[in-house]
From Swiss-Prot:
Lineage, uppermost ranks: Eukaryota, Fungi, Dikarya, Ascomycota, Saccharomycotina
Enzyme class, UniProt record, top EC level: transferase
Pfam families: GHMP_kinases_N
Signal peptide span: none
Name used for this protein in its record: Phosphomevalonate kinase
Binding, ATP: 10, 142-148
Induction / repression: Expression is regulated by the transcription factor NRG1.
Predominant localisation class: cytoplasm
Key words of the record: ATP-binding, Cytoplasm, Kinase, Lipid biosynthesis, Lipid metabolism, Nucleotide-binding, Steroid biosynthesis, Steroid metabolism, Transferase
Length: 432
């Protein structure tokens, strides 16, 4: 019997760069653009186990893995390389150590927000519940929009595989899903990232503080030095308490998040490595900037929390006063931008480059705009803007009326969706 799952994309609103250190909090919003996986067990007449994965929205989107060992990396039969799928299968099987042969088919879908929408054809499922864009090119040739597609992919494939071997794991132990996906994502990337994107894919909108990187680093060293011990150490790590923060959160009532795609593009790893180099070379200077940024981030989170609490205790007054009570939140966002501008200037890395400063300043002039930032590591490719819900239509219209003035920003069709990984109905994907 088939099972289906989905995991959200992310918008990283506060905590860029600081999130790499386990002393700082970050604020990450889960988005309505989701990655999907439908898993179906086939017959088990095979002598060796097999996992077939397809991504029908992209050309050549098929990978077939024959599994001869639970402790070796899977090999794709046509030598097609997909490091994220390989890593996920490898970590799941090393953890589960299945003793019986299995034959699994996984079909992956991604919502339109993850990729450029040029040269696409729309397809809708038989019951009308799901609609996806089909591309004429291979996935490696289609531009991504920076919503966390690799973290979403690893999370949803890990969830579907784990759910096959451990029924109901999604409802009984999300920490297992998170820990497996986090390890697999790091293994695929060959580095221990901050992990906020995987954490958001599993848990949803969160205030996040990272785990100690040594947790995963140590188990990878075991894999290199003593591979036979790896499954045992991996099991221990996945079952352990990582002591990281993932507090559920949500944007306040009446405030909407808009994600603006700006034709540009900047490679996140290059930005991050340059900032880390500056931090190493100028510890005192960087410490001042980090403190300034952290203070602004915490103020931003405090304002959001207080607005949510105010709505919960007295919704009527909150709604009545909302238009006039956003100023402290606007100030907090401006202070985050000042911190990012200082980081840009001191490190000489284009985190909030001049063109983005200009665009965000112009958005700020439109009635109903609470404030905007360059999300995540910053750069040229996106902006995230908070707008009063009753002004969203007018806000978008203003940017469309004068596209050159607003740098031809394209508002991606998505919104906050606070839930993390979810079980879906398999019938919603029939006919795609």
């Amino acid at each position: 019997m088939s099972k289906a799952f989905s995991a959200p994309g992310k918008a990283f609103l506060a905590g860029g760069y600081l999130v790499l250190e386990p002393i700082y909090d970050a604020y990450v919003t889960a988005l309505s653009s989701r990655m999907h996986a439908v898993i179906t067990p086939k017959g088990t007449s095979l002598k060796e186990s097999r996992i077939k994965i397809s991504s029908p929205q992209f050309a050549n989107g098929e990978w077939e893995y024959h599994i001869s060992s639970n402790t070796e990396k899977p090999k794709e039969v046509q030598s097609r390389i997909n490091p994220f799928l390989e890593a996920t299968i490898f970590i799941v099987l090393a953890y589960i150590q299945p003793t019986e042969a299995f034959d699994l088919e996984i079909i992956i879908y991604s919502d339109p927000g993850y990729h450029s929408q040029e040269d696409t054809e729309t397809k809708t499922s038989s019951n009308g519940e799901k609609t996806f864009l089909y591309h004429s090119r291979a996935i490696t040739e289609v531009e991504k929009t920076g919503l966390g597609s690799s973290a979403g992919l690893v999370s949803v494939v890990a969830t579907s595989l784990l759910s096959h071997f451990i029924p109901n794991v999604i409802s009984t132990n999300k920490d297992i899903l998170h820990n497996v996906a986090q390890i697999a994502h790091c293994y695929a990337q060959k580095k221990i990232g901050s992990g906020f994107d995987v954490a958001t894919a599993i848990y949803g909108s969160i205030v996040y503080r990272r785990f100690q990187p040594a947790l995963i680093n140590d188990v990878f060293q075991v894999l290199e030095s003593d591979p036979e011990k790896f499954p045992t150490e991996l099991k221990k790590l996945i079952a352990s308490n990582w002591e990281f923060k993932h507090e559920r959160c949500t944007l306040p009532h009446g405030i909407k998040l808009l994600m603006g795609d700006v034709k540009g593009g900047s490679e996140t790893p290059k930005l991050v490595s340059r900032v880390l180099q500056w931090k190493k070379e100028k510890p005192e200077e960087s410490s001042v900037v980090y403190d300034q940024l952290n203070s602004a981030n915490l103020q931003f989170m405090k304002e959001l929390r207080e607005m949510r609490e105010k709505y919960d205790s007295d919704p009527e007054t909150y709604i009545k006063e909302l238009d006039h009570s956003i100023e402290p939140l606007t100030v907090a966002i401006k202070n985050i931008r000042k911190g990012l501008q200082a980081l840009t200037q001191k490190s000489e890395v284009p985190i909030e480059p001049d063109v983005q400063t200009q665009l965000l300043d112009r958005c700020q002039e439109i009635p109903g705009c609470v404030g905007g930032v360059v999300p995540g590591a910053g750069g040229y490719d996106a902006i995230a803007v908070l707008v009063l819900e009753n002004q969203v239509g007018n806000f978008k219209q203003k940017t469309l009326e004068n596209p050159d003035y607003f740098h031809n920003v394209y508002w991606v069709d998505l919104e906050e969706q606070t839930e993390g990984v979810l079980e879906e109905k398999p019938e919603d994907y029939i006919g795609l």
